[in-house]
Curated annotation (Swiss-Prot):
<keyword id="KW-0472">Membrane</keyword>
<comment type="similarity">
    <text>Belongs to the glycosyltransferase 28 family. MurG subfamily.</text>
</comment>
<feature type="binding site">
    <location>
        <position position="275"/>
    </location>
    <ligand>
        <name>UDP-N-acetyl-alpha-D-glucosamine</name>
    </ligand>
</feature>
<dbReference type="Pfam" id="PF04101">
    <property type="entry name" value="Glyco_tran_28_C"/>
</dbReference>
<keyword id="KW-0131">Cell cycle</keyword>
<keyword id="KW-0132">Cell division</keyword>
<comment type="function">
    <text>Cell wall formation. Catalyzes the transfer of a GlcNAc subunit on undecaprenyl-pyrophosphoryl-MurNAc-pentapeptide (lipid intermediate I) to form undecaprenyl-pyrophosphoryl-MurNAc-(pentapeptide)GlcNAc (lipid intermediate II).</text>
</comment>
<dbReference type="GO" id="GO:0050511">
    <property type="term" value="F:undecaprenyldiphospho-muramoylpentapeptide beta-N-acetylglucosaminyltransferase activity"/>
</dbReference>
<dbReference type="GO" id="GO:0030259">
    <property type="term" value="P:lipid glycosylation"/>
</dbReference>
<protein>
    <recommendedName>
        <fullName>UDP-N-acetylglucosamine--N-acetylmuramyl-(pentapeptide) pyrophosphoryl-undecaprenol N-acetylglucosamine transferase</fullName>
        <ecNumber>2.4.1.227</ecNumber>
    </recommendedName>
</protein>
<feature type="binding site">
    <location>
        <position position="174"/>
    </location>
    <ligand>
        <name>UDP-N-acetyl-alpha-D-glucosamine</name>
    </ligand>
</feature>
<keyword id="KW-1003">Cell membrane</keyword>
<dbReference type="GO" id="GO:0008360">
    <property type="term" value="P:regulation of cell shape"/>
</dbReference>
<keyword id="KW-0808">Transferase</keyword>
<keyword id="KW-0961">Cell wall biogenesis/degradation</keyword>
<feature type="binding site">
    <location>
        <begin position="10"/>
        <end position="12"/>
    </location>
    <ligand>
        <name>UDP-N-acetyl-alpha-D-glucosamine</name>
    </ligand>
</feature>
<dbReference type="GO" id="GO:0005975">
    <property type="term" value="P:carbohydrate metabolic process"/>
</dbReference>
Length: 343
């Protein structure tokens, strides 16, 4: 039985789709990812690539390739005759969801953020079911909306009480990562000497800046490990005492489920400012602190980081507060819904 997963190639959309595909496979379903060209290197799940262009590029080309991709998706979906198309948001999911609507194939939507994305909003009325990652999601209201959680498999782990080194994990994400390379690393390097001796930094950097940031840390005698991408995020989170991160939905789910305190720096250009609202939900539960990316960001981040590293009780309180957020791994619950619907 085939199910098509319509998703975007960025981590926030693709990783939940991959997690769901693996879970559905154990129940006998064959899942095919329909997405854009950025996905192939990220997964071994069967996929079909649509020749899309980013909305921020040439507008004429964007709409031209969107129409072309919609025609390709219509042909492929008609040929596959799937039981359902599950959309994960992003402009890359639009052609496949449109094909499903034209062909009267049941549409199910999953929303990762606290604000229902524009493509998911467009297909809201056509969808049989909308699953959300946060207990509260703007624009997702009605009987067909259910809170399942995001699709991440991260478990909470405790720290060793005898550990004297504080591990700081810095997750830049795919959007605006240069800010983390420049500002976050600079703030860490400007900490007092005694504090720098007590920290270890694990940081995701852009490929072009890895050596530059590593040299900066070494010049300040800061123990560090840097990489463009970490494929063992669960282990990295398990070892972290504090996380500095963008506020993408998947990152927040992983950090919160790992029971880690965090400083979130929302990407200021995210659609509908959804990263800010994602982080605000966690901050309202006192499990994180938001630092906005603006002209005062360096000063504000310095103050927040200094305060947290000087106050172990505050860090512990934030860690304990992660359980109050209600964030959960929704994979098992969502699979049960799918199995029940199509059994």
């Amino acid at each position: 039985m085939d199910i098509i997963l319509a998703t975007g190639g960025t981590g926030g959309h693709i990783f939940p789709a991959i997690a769901l595909a693996k879970a559905l496979k154990t129940q006998g379903y064959n899942c095919i990812l329909f997405t854009d060209k950025k996905t192939n290197k990220n997964t071994d799940i069967e996929s079909y690539t649509l020749p899309l262009r980013r909305p921020s590029s040439n507008k004429f080309k964007f709409f031209l390739f969107l129409i072309y991709s919609s025609m390709l998706a219509l042909y492929q979906v008609r040929k596959l005759k799937p039981k359902s198309v599950i959309g994960f948001g992003s402009y890359a999911s639009f052609p496949t969801l449109l094909a499903a609507r034209v062909l009267s194939i049941p549409i199910i939507l999953h929303e990762q953020n606290t604000v229902l994305g524009r493509v998911n909003r467009f297909f809201f009325k056509s969808a049989k079911l909308i699953a959300t990652s946060f207990p509260e999601t703007k624009y997702a209201e009605g009987n067909k909306c259910i809170f399942t959680g995001n699709f991440v498999d991260i478990k909470a782990q405790s720290h060793s009480s005898t550990e004297k080194i504080l591990n700081i994990l810095v997750i830049a994400g795919s959007q605006g990562a240069n800010f983390f390379d420049d500002v976050v690393s600079s703030v860490i390097c400007d900490l007092p000497i005694k504090m720098k001796k007590k920290i270890r930094v694990t940081q995701q950097c852009t490929k072009k800046n890895v050596n530059k940031v590593k040299s900066l840390y070494k010049s300040e005698k800061i123990d560090c490990e840097l990489s463009e991408f970490f494929d063992d995020m669960e282990n990295r989170l398990a070892n972290a005492h504090l996380v500095i991160s963008r506020a993408g939905a998947t990152s927040i789910a992983e950090i919160t489920l790992a029971r880690r305190s965090a400083i979130y720096i929302p990407y200021p250009y995210s659609k509908d400012n959804h990263q800010f609202y994602n982080a605000k939900y966690i901050e309202d539960s006192r499990a994180a602190i938001i630092v906005k990316q603006n002209s005062e960001a360096k000063k504000n981040l310095t103050e927040v980081l200094f305060d947290l590293l000087n106050n172990s009780q505050k860090l512990r309180d934030m860690t304990n507060s992660t359980e109050k957020t209600g964030i959960k791994n929704g994979t098992t619950e969502f699979v049960k819904v799918i199995v029940h619907r199509f059994s």
